[in-house]
């Protein structure tokens, strides 16, 4: 009986890792979702709201916020940290979504990935050039500590 339980446990652990999403697939899926929203015939306000949803699901806003504040974080008490994170999230989502909503049907192609360690992978992509803008290289730092829920 003990052997059966161990075998089942190992099977399910292996099965769960089989369903984890690869960082390059995660990035391509995320940019495809954003591109779909940007190509819809909806108001700019609705595009912004839908882009904010994607950002909340895929970006480690808390991590970006603490990275942005740097060592000053050590001088804040818990209430100040919470207030800062609240203000930073509002700023980040507003800035991110309003700037991105200016693009009309952007095409981003994932090129390759570089696994830095078990927690981070760099995914390289390009924003395809149009007559109005040059090609832009974009590197995404993907936090992969939880492979079932990678974050930008």
Where on the chain are the PLM-derived regions?
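Sec-dependent N-terminal signal peptides
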Residues: 4-16
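Surface-exposed, charged secondary-structure patches
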Residues: 94-139
